Amino acid sequence: MKKLLMVQGTTSDAGKSVLVAGLCRVLARKGVKVAPFKPQNMALNSAVTKEGGEIGRAQAVQAQACRIEPSVHMNPVLIKPNSDTGAQIILQGKALTNMDAYGFHNYKKVAMDTVMDSFARLKDEYQAIMIEGAGSPAEINLRQNDIANMGFAEEADVPVIIVADIDRGGVFAHLYGTLALLSPSEQARVKGFVINRFRGDIKLLESGLDWLEEKTGKPVIGVLPFLHGLNLEAEDAITSQQALSDEVKLKVVVPVLTRISNHTDFDVLRLHPQIDLRYVGKGERLEHADLIILPGSKSVRDDLRYLREQGWDKDILRHLRFGGKVLGICGGYQMLGESIRDPFGVEGEPGESVGLGLLKTRTELTQDKCLINTKGQLSLNGKHVNVTGYEIHVGRSQVNEYQPITKDDGQLEGALSECGQIMGSYLHGFLDSEAALELICEWVNGVRIKAQNHQQLKEQAIDRIADAIEEHLDLSQLGI
């Protein structure tokens, strides 16, 4: 019999993604062939799958917890916002179209067919599926045609547990209120509650747990402790927590663009004890750094306009005058060039924007999206190191500069300015390659930094979650 379980939350960021990742690792360690599943995800941080499709990064991390390759069927509906009211809709890894919120709400009945198709494929292949909901199942205005939470659970007939973050406060109101707002049939499939991120003496919580169980008739399956320094990729909110030592060798600043994407590119910098990574927000200056990194963006021309509104273009020029280095990744790479054309209105109104003019490149946004995992060699300062990464972009750039990356298929990638201070690349995640990070640090200011094994750090984090789940949850109540 298949092991199926859906984790829903009282709020966004309640701990659904982490709990699913941990449950996946618990099962994988027992030899169970398990896969993650999230019917609908809204995120600007995405990953490339084995099929050359696109899914939310949380599902890619969960696949790692299962010790399998990520697949488009693990997240069949991905919504990538490109404005306050509109988003790109991605079905089974491929971009379908742009829709406003009302249009997608009406499209959900069609999207449910795609969701159930992917779910059926995973059920055919795996012994267990750990499913993640989205946001809260109790959003009254979103319940009609729901495909992300109870709408899916009812259609697929799967049991549900509800998780809440006690660190935010109000955990009993969150859990009791969420359950109360569900229909009788939805309430019946809730098997219990999990309380996440608890600090302190569990005895002080016991009276509240007893009250909750008495009022709802549902068991509290367990209370997970606050896991300090848990270094897993954040899907939405930018994480600024660092691991600094007294010996900082490199200072990096990243401007927070309005549609910043794949900020997980910078986790490897944030977690290094000798690198001081600082995110710079609205009204702040890009200063006191060795390296400025322009991140990816879901709306490159709009974010380029925003960058100029903040005066960051002037900060970049001043930084370069004093010998600093600038790196652009994906959308940030496009901004560094001479122009960005969007003749088809792929990311908004059709038109052309003047770039920062720091690289001799010209970019045209196309209707076909490049989705590929890439391996190659990075050549800087007369040194050559292996590099891996992934590409997710709709632009094609004409480059009239030295190209520092040679892909395994022989294609050249990226651009390095003649002055040697400015570099751009379409490769997300290439800083995760230890040798590449060390070479980039040496390029920036000549410092030698020993890179950490980023994959190993993620593995350790996943195992910590699984250990906590095995210790603090009554898994027998879940059949695990």
Swiss-Prot record:
What SUPFAM superfamilies does the entry give? Class I glutamine amidotransferase-like (SSF52317), P-loop containing nucleoside triphosphate hydrolases (SSF52540)
What UniProt keywords are attached to this protein's entry? Cobalamin biosynthesis, Glutamine amidotransferase
**UniProt xrefs under InterPro entries:** Class_I_gatase-like, CobQ/CobB/MinD/ParA_Nub-bd_dom, CobQ_GATase1, CobQ_N, CobQ_synth, GATase_3, P-loop_NTPase
Q: Which domain of life is it from?
A: Bacteria
Ranges for domain GATase cobBQ-type come to 249-436
| NCBIfam families the record matches | cobQ, PRK00784.1
What name does UniProt use for this protein? Answer: Cobyric acid synthase
| Species per Swiss-Prot/TrEMBL record | Vibrio vulnificus (strain YJ016)
Kindly list the organism's lineage. Bacteria, Pseudomonadati, Pseudomonadota, Gammaproteobacteria, Vibrionales
Q: Which gene encodes it?
A: cobQ
